[in-house]
From Swiss-Prot:
<dbReference type="InterPro" id="IPR052034">
    <property type="entry name" value="NasD-like"/>
</dbReference>
<feature type="binding site">
    <location>
        <position position="427"/>
    </location>
    <ligand>
        <name>[2Fe-2S] cluster</name>
    </ligand>
</feature>
<feature type="binding site">
    <location>
        <begin position="193"/>
        <end position="225"/>
    </location>
    <ligand>
        <name>NAD(+)</name>
    </ligand>
</feature>
<dbReference type="GO" id="GO:0042128">
    <property type="term" value="P:nitrate assimilation"/>
</dbReference>
<dbReference type="GO" id="GO:0006113">
    <property type="term" value="P:fermentation"/>
</dbReference>
<dbReference type="GO" id="GO:0106316">
    <property type="term" value="F:nitrite reductase NADH activity"/>
</dbReference>
<dbReference type="InterPro" id="IPR036188">
    <property type="entry name" value="FAD/NAD-bd_sf"/>
</dbReference>
<keyword id="KW-0349">Heme</keyword>
<keyword id="KW-0004">4Fe-4S</keyword>
<feature type="binding site">
    <location>
        <begin position="44"/>
        <end position="79"/>
    </location>
    <ligand>
        <name>FAD</name>
    </ligand>
</feature>
<dbReference type="InterPro" id="IPR045854">
    <property type="entry name" value="NO2/SO3_Rdtase_4Fe4S_sf"/>
</dbReference>
<dbReference type="InterPro" id="IPR017121">
    <property type="entry name" value="Nitrite_Rdtase_lsu"/>
</dbReference>
<feature type="binding site">
    <location>
        <position position="425"/>
    </location>
    <ligand>
        <name>[2Fe-2S] cluster</name>
    </ligand>
</feature>
<dbReference type="InterPro" id="IPR006066">
    <property type="entry name" value="NO2/SO3_Rdtase_FeS/sirohaem_BS"/>
</dbReference>
<dbReference type="InterPro" id="IPR041854">
    <property type="entry name" value="BFD-like_2Fe2S-bd_dom_sf"/>
</dbReference>
<dbReference type="GO" id="GO:0051537">
    <property type="term" value="F:2 iron, 2 sulfur cluster binding"/>
</dbReference>
<dbReference type="InterPro" id="IPR016156">
    <property type="entry name" value="FAD/NAD-linked_Rdtase_dimer_sf"/>
</dbReference>
Amino acid sequence: MSKVRLAIIGNGMVGHRFIEDLLDKSDAANFDITVFCEEPRIAYDRVHLSSYFSHHTAEELSLVREGFYEKHGIKVLVGERAITINRQEKVIHSSAGRTVFYDKLIMATGSYPWIPPIKGSDTQDCFVYRTIEDLNAIESCARRSKRGAVVGGGLLGLEAAGALKNLGIETHVIEFAPMLMAEQLDQMGGEQLRRKIESMGVRVHTSKNTLEIVQEGVEARKTMRFADGSELEVDFIVFSTGIRPRDKLATQCGLDVAPRGGIVINDSCQTSDPDIYAIGECASWNNRVFGLVAPGYKMAQVAVDHILGSENAFEGADLSAKLKLLGVDVGGIGDAHGRTPGARSYVYLDESKEIYKRLIVSEDNKTLLGAVLVGDTSDYGNLLQLVLNAIELPENPDSLILPAHSGSGKPSIGVDKLPDSAQICSCFDVTKGDLIAAINKGCHTVAALKAETKAGTGCGGCIPLVTQVLNAELAKQGIEVNNNLCEHFAYSRQELFHLIRVEGIKTFEELLAKHGKGYGCEVCKPTVGSLLASCWNEYILKPEHTPLQDSNDNFLANIQKDGTYSVIPRSPGGEITPEGLMAVGRIAREFNLYTKITGSQRLAMFGAQKDDLPEIWRQLIEAGFETGHAYAKALRMAKTCVGSTWCRYGVGDSVGLGVELENRYKGIRTPHKMKFGVSGCTRECSEAQGKDVGIIATEKGWNLYVCGNGGMKPRHADLLAADIDRETLIKYLDRFMMFYIRTADKLTRTAPWLENLEGGIDYLKAVIIDDKLGLNAHLEEEMARLREAVLCEWTETVNTPSAQTRFKHFINSDKRDPNVQMVPEREQHRPATPYERIPVTLVEDNA
């Protein structure tokens, strides 16, 4: 069977999604795929385009896994544009003079930004907000500018305004309509959004018709002149006034094009030529062009199914949207303007908290038609499902948007009421039925469901509903959703933390007597030991705490494969003096230890006998060192590059900040180990974005990333805050650390903790930055108290003779373990293998 020649014109988000869907459902060997990628880089995420200003690396936005196209034999023509299509011969001619033949053609040409016919709009320092190249040009211009304007007060316009504000520009938004986001919000919602945005320093000008832009000004380089006679001087202008389908190729080759633009498609996404499909913003279905990515993804799925002979149809798309604009949560659902005949409204307004909510319901009060949410979108998921699935409303619909008081909860739609066809994840078109099928296959955690179905791996907004579906299905199957720590405590780790803190419990025995049963086990003892340390930070080798410690904490060192231990003193930020180096060398030589520089920028000594540990540490402490907590569930290190102190590219003192942070948080017990990274510029030599906490210097301060991870399951850290000063950075870190300590499950790193946190990074931002839970003052106080209690555990041990008896090999003998054997290698030594070991006589012959 010959391969199907498949050509794809366009390598944007929808074009790439088509390829992914195709390869999910069919073998790449069945196709000969050629992709025209007009831009200088392969598919990237335009939805999160503004984040580019934070990390300045196109790779961060890339949608294509490394080696993906090569692995599947896909030919991608980067920087090459399709210029003509010969439908009779089924051949495409490119800007590079190439000819590509096809059996099936996918047109995913997207859209182009429309600029109103304003005189002067094509002059220097006038931009659009569409590609990475656009953002580079805007940022370059911003460096020599003070004042900028965004023409257009819709979704993308406000996103662009947020980017300009973050660049330090005096920002103005110019909107032709009398309100912002006129398509998604009603009048009151638009006014509330305007007030919130203006309170952040962005100037908003509505009902403004721009007549011309002239290259002159007293305080700036340009002057915008409006129809009402007013003027505004700015240095540069960003246009965000809508999009138009890119259908020129279709017109040239004779395909049907809609009167208002867009390549006409049927329910199978076929054009007027059955061998040519159109998907995404270039397509017109029933005279409608969809400017959001989710409908484009659905079109890609339909086109794939039709090519493979499966039944599927595009039936339109819901254009509801939830997003954060300039830090303001905004949501619009369904008939947000109440245009349905007989529609009635319920309105909630809290001026003190700047929250506005409106429900639009049917005349009989039984069906939700639409909603407007400004300032708080926590109800968005439930309200959207009510609209999409026409679920009957409760007796008092206003209860859906009124705040819950005195512990009373809001009425829930109940996931059982949702049909299996209900779309839970719009990013990947995952239905409730898809989730149930995955649960029946054994996916019994949110993380497992995400891996199996991709639900929640896009914008993350569906995670609360995914969790509800999971818990409901597990309950139906009789699988108890139990987060108890173990059989001895009917509480979760988080609940035990609060019991210990509130009741001032200081020992395992006291906690067991008050809230547990039995004698404890290998699960609860080390967990409670960690909790007690996280709450009170007492010396872990106190007699009442010693039985709770695992093997490493028991001896304040990591046990190795041969029964010896490693010794790793702290070197904050990777900094160490020549005297310190010589001291480590002398000690390693004296005790015959193997030495190595670790991946954490620390000097490690291996092969220490247990009974030598106190003396080794006594000498290290005398040389100015302290424990590095390499054995503990705590901060291990803050890895740094040399930063602006030495590097000609550095823009921030990464070493200085790394040293400060490592010393600030050292010795504080956390649910799992933590690693920090601090980079002095975006070249990222300390690999900060692969750490639990990553900090990168910018021209304006520091970018703070959290919940990254290396190891077996690498995870890129999420940006928590951008361009913040040192004081704000430390404040956010104090809160983040304590919130993690309070809420994470036992032995959970920050990466899976965030992945299982309902609301993900947006929720974490709301807690840490916006104080959503009203906890920040308490979190800062708890961190301050823990820091005051920090001690070097080895200093305490060396100064406590009774604590050193545990380091003897044998209770009744001063002899050492004869099974420890070393062999030489590369001028040092290592543990002997079983084949290299010399037999040991354990019983002496006294004859």
